[in-house]
């Protein structure tokens, strides 16, 4: 298998699922794991290969069973922008707007504050098990799957990943392996060469997603430039561009979206939920809107071939109402309170 990758040959989904099973069963050496992760990244993974790797991870995961549809708002990370936690804030706003959210995430790897870090600073308990996460979704409208809790066998790849210290195929798998397997997603990808490939995974699953990368490198919908976007629905993919100026958002310098550590970013989140206007609120509104669009598409609502700006404008209005009506701040308070009463089941 390593020889095939070294020769630039693609693997089947069955091949990569087998390889991931070997890794997560602790049957592979650190050298083999490192070589595999780097080789497939250098070759360039296919949707089939990524889908197989995700399948292998799901076979070892603690899965979450939820009632009905939900959306995830997640990114690969690795954009090194130092931005505030836009996807985390957007997740809370989307849930407050009435759309069920199951977010999958982890602590920061290459930044000062990951999604898990800022949620913890906001008072949300991280180490909840499948039943507790499902209860949060059922009672509050949002749950968080902390990756180490739900993918414990991934620890067997940890040493190899730390030793080589460069992005590998494992960096791409987080957005593809939400343990609740929601049918919709807003997915940011920091790697431009993989944007279409990641979209292809969702297309093969029959899921609905907006897969995005800002022209400034942000693994979110940016407001400093346009955003390269793949709209995925019903097994089909369409490429488009999101321009914030068409949504009434003035372009800003990327510095306006930069944050700090978890406590700083938690303070920014509280400020946004309190109704503070500005660049961060605008970014949260447009990303929240995109998640709402993806969720609607998963339920057969909306036209995936229509100009995405029209649907985004409607979604932004819903998101703004959830903030300005106090629902986002109230939901965060309820979520934090409930999560701290639950165990790790």
From Swiss-Prot:
Binding site for Mg(2+) 1: 87, 220
Functional pathway: Amino-acid biosynthesis; L-tryptophan biosynthesis; L-tryptophan from chorismate: step 2/5
Binding site for anthranilate 1: 75, 106
Enzyme Commission code: 2.4.2.18
GO BP field: L-tryptophan biosynthetic process
Entry binding sites for Mg(2+) 2: 219-220
Catalytic activity: N-(5-phospho-beta-D-ribosyl)anthranilate + diphosphate = 5-phospho-alpha-D-ribose 1-diphosphate + anthranilate
EC class (word): transferase
Binding locations of 5-phospho-alpha-D-ribose 1-diphosphate: 75, 78-79, 83, 85-88, 103-111, 115
One Pfam short name: Glycos_trans_3N
Keywords: Amino-acid biosynthesis, Aromatic amino acid biosynthesis, Glycosyltransferase, Magnesium, Metal-binding, Transferase, Tryptophan biosynthesis
Function: Catalyzes the transfer of the phosphoribosyl group of 5-phosphorylribose-1-pyrophosphate (PRPP) to anthranilate to yield N-(5'-phosphoribosyl)-anthranilate (PRA).
Quaternary data: Homodimer.
Family: Belongs to the anthranilate phosphoribosyltransferase family.
The protein's name: Anthranilate phosphoribosyltransferase
Organism expressing this protein natively: Nocardia farcinica (strain IFM 10152)
Gene giving rise to this polypeptide: trpD
């Amino acid at each position: 298998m390593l020889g095939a990758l070294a020769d630039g040959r693609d693997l089947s989904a069955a091949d990569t699922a087998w390889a991931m099973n070997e890794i997560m069963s602790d049957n592979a050496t650190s050298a083999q794991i490192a070589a595999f992760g780097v080789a497939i990244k250098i070759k360039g993974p296919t949707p089939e290969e990524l889908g197989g790797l995700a399948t292998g991870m799901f076979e070892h995961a603690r899965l979450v069973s939820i009632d009905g549809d939900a959306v995830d708002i997640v990114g690969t990370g690795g954009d090194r922008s130092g931005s505030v936690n836009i996807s985390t804030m957007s997740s809370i706003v989307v849930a407050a707007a009435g759309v069920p959210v199951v977010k999958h995430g982890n602590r920061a790897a290459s930044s000062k504050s990951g999604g898990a870090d800022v949620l913890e600073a906001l008072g949300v308990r991280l180490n909840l098990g499948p039943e507790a996460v499902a209860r949060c979704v059922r009672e509050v409208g949002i749950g968080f799957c902390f990756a180490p809790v739900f993918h414990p066998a991934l620890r067997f790849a940890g040493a190899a990943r730390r030793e080589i210290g460069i992005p590998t195929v494992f960096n791409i798998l987080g957005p593809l392996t939400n343990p609740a397997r929601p049918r919709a997603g807003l997915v940011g990808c920091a790697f431009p060469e993989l944007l279409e490939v990641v979209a292809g995974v969702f297309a093969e699953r029959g899921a609905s997603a907006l897969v995005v990368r800002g022209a400034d490198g942000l693994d979110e919908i940016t407001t400093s430039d346009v955003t390269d976007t793949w709209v995925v629905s019903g097994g089909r993919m369409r490429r488009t561009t999101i321009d914030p100026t068409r949504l009434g958002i003035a372009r800003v310098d990327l510095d306006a979206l930069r944050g700090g550590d978890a406590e700083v970013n938690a303070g920014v989140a509280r400020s946004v939920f309190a109704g503070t206007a500005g660049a961060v609120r605008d970014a949260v509104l447009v990303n929240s809107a995109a998640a709402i669009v993806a969720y609607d598409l998963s339920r057969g609502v909306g036209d995936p071939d229509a100009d995405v700006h029209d649907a985004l404008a409607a979604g932004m209005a819903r998101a703004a109402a959830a903030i300005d009506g106090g629902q986002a701040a109230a939901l965060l308070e309820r979520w934090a309170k409930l999560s701290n009463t639950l165990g790790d089941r």
